[in-house]
Design a protein with these regions (language model features):
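Charged catalytic cores and adjacent phosphate/nucleic-acid-binding surfaces used
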Residues: 2-29, 43-81, 90-93, 172-186, ...
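Flexible, glycine/proline-enriched loop segments at strand-loop-helix junctions
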Residues: 87-96, 121-124, 160-161
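Conserved phosphoryl-transfer catalytic core
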Residues: 95-122
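Short, amphipathic alpha-helical segments
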Residues: 80, 91-102, 128
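Conserved acidic, metal-coordinating active-site core of Asp-based
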Residues: 127-189
Length: 275
């Protein structure tokens, strides 16, 4: 069993990279990847650890971009986390998204909600703030009772306090990963709620720009969707990957390795990636 989609406190997870490794070992995984949002900060910490010889680790990232008027995510595996252009672009994206967070904070404060940057950072000024941090703060302040309520009432794309992320072209995203020596993979293709036809066209278009794989196995994918993605993966000669999309207590129903229970990502997929 492997898990190629995991988030730590370096983005919107609630466990540190070291704690992630401890959980991976406790689960007896064959291999894993850390794929924090728009940052490679956790990779060095994991590489500095004394990992078991039989545990495979592949550096990763999850980058947000835009397609068909919606936000999509592209995973990058085997990236050179020291690549200058990669880090320059990530810093630029983070600066723009930091301003987006300030804009959302201002909207909340105008309506009297006690949302501040300090509360969102929760003691870590270097954290990459996402809407999950807003949800956690809304719950901590007693404004919402759950993450689902926070997103449906305050943070969803049609909500008053939502501010879109700065546009990032998927072609540029793919090129960024490729130029950093990485393997670009479309994350959770069915989570964007495109039609089957649009999803297939998206995969086809991205393949022409350098997409190398699709995330077939994911906590949100049911067996019918997995079967469909397997079909498209073979049709377009792409790699298959999979992972839980673990975020710790921010998504408490998702566990490393097993997702919501039935998830099983075959071991050979990490070997395919590494080869």
């Amino acid at each position: 069993m492997i898990d190629l989609h995991i988030h730590s406190t370096c983005s919107d997870g609630t466990f540190t990279p070291k704690q992630i490794v401890q959980k991976v070992i406790a689960k007896g995984l064959y291999g894993f990847s850390l794929t924090d949002h728009d940052t490679v900060d956790g990779i060095l910490e994991i590489l500095a650890m004394d990992l078991p010889d039989d545990l495979k680790f592949i550096p990763g990232i999850e980058i947000s971009c835009d397609a068909l008027h919606r936000e999509i995510h592209v995973l990058g595996y085997g990236i050179n986390y020291k690549d200058q252009q990669l880090n320059h672009t990530l810093n630029m994206l983070r600066d723009k998204r930091f301003q987006r967070n300030l804009d959302m904070i201002e909207l909340f404060q105008k309506d009297g909600y006690p949302i501040t940057l300090e509360k969102l950072q929760n003691g870590d000024p270097h954290t990459v703030i996402t809407r999950a941090h807003f949800a956690r703060t809304l719950i901590a302040e007693g404004i919402c009772s759950s993450t689902d309520q926070a997103f449906s009432k305050y943070l969803g794309e049609k909500c008053k306090y939502y501010v879109p992320k700065p546009f990032f072209d998927p072609k540029d995203c793919l090129r960024l990963i490729l130029d950093a020596g990485g393997i670009p993979v479309l994350a959770h293709p069915f989570l964007y709620k495109f039609s089957n036809e649009d999803t297939k066209h998206l995969i086809q278009d991205l393949k022409e720009e350098g997409l190398a794989g699709i995330e077939v196995y994911h906590s949100s994918h049911h067996i019918g969707q997995i079967t469909k993605l397997r079909q498209w993966q073979k049709e377009y000669d792409l790699l298959a990957t999979g992972g839980s999309d673990f975020h710790g207590t921010n998504k408490p129903d998702i566990e490393i390795g097993t997702g919501r229970g039935p998830l099983f990502v075959p071991d050979h997929l990490i070997d395919d990636l590494m080869n």
